[in-house]
Amino acid sequence: MQLNPAEISDLIKAKIENLSVNAEVRTCGTVISVTDGIVRIHGLSDAMQGEMLEFPGNTFGLAMNLERDSVGAVVLGEYEHIKEGDTVTCTGRILEVPVGRELVGRVVDALGRPIDGKGPINTTLTAPIEKIAPGVIARKSVDQPMQTGLKAIDSMVPVGRGQRELIIGDRQTGKTAVALDAIVNQKGTGVICIYVAIGQKASSIANVVRKLEEHGAMEHTIVVAATASEAAALQYIAPYSGCTMGEFFRDRGEDALIVYDDLSKQAVAYRQISLLLRRPPGREAYPGDVFYLHSRLLERAARVNEHEVEKLTNGEVKGKTGSLTALPIIETQAGDVSAFVPTNVISITDGQIFLETDLFNAGIRPAINAGISVSRVGGAAQTKVIKKLGGGIRLALAQYRELAAFSQFASDLDEATRKQLEHGEVVTELMKQKQFSTLNTAEMALTLWAINNGSYSDVPVAKALAFESEFLSFVRTQHPEVLEAVNASGAMSDESEKTLEAAMKSFKSSYAYQA
């Protein structure tokens, strides 16, 4: 066989000319150890803090400890199949979750994957879970109300759009019930709600979703669930994922409300991760940055001004402010609000609603302690009519508590003291409200107006709630224009007051309310 040198030369030349030298450069590392969802990796020299790492079997992790000779990462999900010697690659991306209107009405996990069996979520938009909070110049002061529909909250500790109001109390004091009422009350207001369930039983979360569906609230709600059975890493990132989903609406000039239920369990999950990563423990074995864990999350709840919205939407939305209101929940142990995490979150938020076991067991629900519950900015956002009529409620309750304690030692009370005690009892009774029976501004104003003008002075305490309910029904049927006027203007005119006075007289003459 004759070899042709020229032919061979041409073949080699063609091969060299067509040689593809494109190479994908990816930093790879090797798994050194796997323990309790924490993976130590050698060789990832270019890893970023918070970067997504890819493990075999399409599993992802989060780089958290960048040390001299190894990287400590947490696995986001199952880790049983990861073994020593496996190859890990850097993705070059920070953890992102899907965002957009397509998520509304769905139940997703901490990574934004649907878990409600209703098929895939068709959104192309994603956003990083960690974002820098809006700066001072980008913010606008809180001056619009975020109505919860609960008399005790809207009259005494009002919440404004863009505020952070902590709900704090022992277990089984109705913390979730207050938050769910606030979500249900946003129906028809255009406010998108995000409910983040952290470390709860799957059955409890299913129950919450069912209740929201029953009251038509899932139409404007996203539920982010990281159940107690899921990895600690997912419980740790769930609030950040939910916050990113809420920021999508805030940055487009809309209003959103986010509930974190609850941040105590997130702190416990973060403590677990930190201790397994061998980070030095501090007070109550929490790591040193547990304050920053919550502050960087809650600072993202804000009201942003028109210029910021215009800038973030590239000029598409003009003249609109956006807001993200946060209702974080903290569970205390035996009423100890001076523990590490409760004191941290109290100092970060713009006020707190204290729920007490004794009040709850006494049948006062919502079990709000009006004496130590405050709203530091909500007063500026309160509806005019509620601010005017509700001003005396807190004072009446404070005086009642003081006199009630004093009256235990005194046998004979003068007439003025006795009247004040009776008034306080009626106010306490009227602040009670059943779950999912929220009131609008006008209905709430009606009750407060009746308290202020002494309409309940001759009504027995036991019949006060029934009297309130019947009077509301009476005004709804006989004078609906009064309620419409108050809802429309946010104030009560002299004409409306005269109509209500006549209505009260007429109602009292026809309704048998005496003992």
Swiss-Prot record:
<dbReference type="InterPro" id="IPR005294">
    <property type="entry name" value="ATP_synth_F1_asu"/>
</dbReference>
<comment type="similarity">
    <text>Belongs to the ATPase alpha/beta chains family.</text>
</comment>
<dbReference type="InterPro" id="IPR027417">
    <property type="entry name" value="P-loop_NTPase"/>
</dbReference>
<comment type="subunit">
    <text>F-type ATPases have 2 components, CF(1) - the catalytic core - and CF(0) - the membrane proton channel. CF(1) has five subunits: alpha(3), beta(3), gamma(1), delta(1), epsilon(1). CF(0) has three main subunits: a(1), b(2) and c(9-12). The alpha and beta chains form an alternating ring which encloses part of the gamma chain. CF(1) is attached to CF(0) by a central stalk formed by the gamma and epsilon chains, while a peripheral stalk is formed by the delta and b chains.</text>
</comment>
<keyword id="KW-0472">Membrane</keyword>
<dbReference type="GO" id="GO:0043531">
    <property type="term" value="F:ADP binding"/>
</dbReference>
<keyword id="KW-0067">ATP-binding</keyword>
<dbReference type="GO" id="GO:0005524">
    <property type="term" value="F:ATP binding"/>
</dbReference>
<dbReference type="GO" id="GO:0005886">
    <property type="term" value="C:plasma membrane"/>
</dbReference>
<dbReference type="InterPro" id="IPR038376">
    <property type="entry name" value="ATP_synth_asu_C_sf"/>
</dbReference>
<dbReference type="InterPro" id="IPR023366">
    <property type="entry name" value="ATP_synth_asu-like_sf"/>
</dbReference>
<feature type="site" description="Required for activity">
    <location>
        <position position="373"/>
    </location>
</feature>
<comment type="function">
    <text>Produces ATP from ADP in the presence of a proton gradient across the membrane. The alpha chain is a regulatory subunit.</text>
</comment>
<dbReference type="InterPro" id="IPR020003">
    <property type="entry name" value="ATPase_a/bsu_AS"/>
</dbReference>
<dbReference type="GO" id="GO:0045259">
    <property type="term" value="C:proton-transporting ATP synthase complex"/>
</dbReference>
<dbReference type="InterPro" id="IPR000194">
    <property type="entry name" value="ATPase_F1/V1/A1_a/bsu_nucl-bd"/>
</dbReference>
<keyword id="KW-0997">Cell inner membrane</keyword>
<dbReference type="GO" id="GO:0046933">
    <property type="term" value="F:proton-transporting ATP synthase activity, rotational mechanism"/>
</dbReference>
<keyword id="KW-0547">Nucleotide-binding</keyword>
<dbReference type="InterPro" id="IPR033732">
    <property type="entry name" value="ATP_synth_F1_a_nt-bd_dom"/>
</dbReference>
<dbReference type="InterPro" id="IPR000793">
    <property type="entry name" value="ATP_synth_asu_C"/>
</dbReference>
<dbReference type="Pfam" id="PF00306">
    <property type="entry name" value="ATP-synt_ab_C"/>
</dbReference>
<protein>
    <recommendedName>
        <fullName>ATP synthase subunit alpha</fullName>
        <ecNumber>7.1.2.2</ecNumber>
    </recommendedName>
</protein>
<keyword id="KW-0813">Transport</keyword>
<keyword id="KW-0375">Hydrogen ion transport</keyword>
<dbReference type="InterPro" id="IPR004100">
    <property type="entry name" value="ATPase_F1/V1/A1_a/bsu_N"/>
</dbReference>
<keyword id="KW-1003">Cell membrane</keyword>
<feature type="binding site">
    <location>
        <begin position="169"/>
        <end position="176"/>
    </location>
    <ligand>
        <name>ATP</name>
    </ligand>
</feature>
<dbReference type="GO" id="GO:0015986">
    <property type="term" value="P:proton motive force-driven ATP synthesis"/>
</dbReference>
<dbReference type="Pfam" id="PF00006">
    <property type="entry name" value="ATP-synt_ab"/>
</dbReference>
<dbReference type="InterPro" id="IPR036121">
    <property type="entry name" value="ATPase_F1/V1/A1_a/bsu_N_sf"/>
</dbReference>
<keyword id="KW-0139">CF(1)</keyword>
<dbReference type="Pfam" id="PF02874">
    <property type="entry name" value="ATP-synt_ab_N"/>
</dbReference>
<keyword id="KW-1278">Translocase</keyword>
<keyword id="KW-0066">ATP synthesis</keyword>
<keyword id="KW-0406">Ion transport</keyword>
